[in-house]
Amino acid sequence: VTGCGSNADDAKNDTQASKASESETSANADQEAAMHVADLIDAIYVQERTDDTDKQCKEAKEAWDKLTDAQKELVEGENADPDYFGRDTGDASKDDPRNQDDIGENEILVVSFGTSFNDSRVADIKGVEDAIAAANPDWSVRRAFTAQIIINHVQARDDEKIDNMDQALERAVKNGVKNLVVQPTHLMHGAEYDELSETVEKYKDKFESVKIAEPLLGEVGSDATVVNEDKKAVAEILTEEAVEKAGYDSLDAAKEEGTAFVFMGHGTSHTAKISYSQMQSQMTDLGYENVFIGTVEGEPEDTSCESVI
């Protein structure tokens, strides 16, 4: 009887061991599949476009689509995570990459850093491009992003191809554009604006005329007290909008209730960081005593979150 019992126990143990082994094998397979996709995502999470970029974007999405829901949750790499393909950022079909040919002789190239959030891209970047097109009916408006990482993300996830700077300028040359205006959507004369200008300089001789517009805040100025009409316009519009959205009749009314408005920038180590201090000077010049300019990364120091608070 004991022997029979032992055989039954052994069989039960063997079955449990077999199931455990199968479970471990399945888990390992899931992890390997997820790691493969993570590697493919990390391969396109780069700032340089190569001859293999289009192929890599396609491969990454196809591999993601083959994963089970459980496997997708395991995707994790240096930059890869489940949100890269899995997060819903809106309907990409509502966007217009503005990468068409048939440009004509006059082109306005709107250059943005870019965003992979579809709803934001449609409302903000496309909104600016559409407004520029409406105001300049005799000019063709095209788009370029400076962030290849974002271009790759949108292409891989949504199959929407957006030109980088070189692609957009080469397209302009190929289409026989004579007069080119480059309109950045950048905030100020930072590193992105410098790189933009350097890229345009390489193509300067390909056109009869090339003009690069100022960023939103205009020229930088020599010190923190120097302001300009661009900064004034931005300060007035931002403050008016913020006061209205906060439900106050005026900035003074908000002040009486002890309410302050803080406009946050990213912050930068670039020499253009003085622009943040200049915007604070502009707010002060306008008499906006309860309006402050802050920076997330704390450069310049006088606009760091701690200083503002």
For each of these PLM feature ranges, what is it?
Residues 2-3:
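C-terminal motif of bacterial Sec signal peptides marking the signal peptidase cleavage site
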Residues 25-88:
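Beta-rich interaction/scaffold domains
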Residues 6:
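Short, conserved catalytic or interaction motifs in soluble domains
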Residues 12-32:
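Post-signal peptide N-terminal segment of mature Sec-exported envelope proteins
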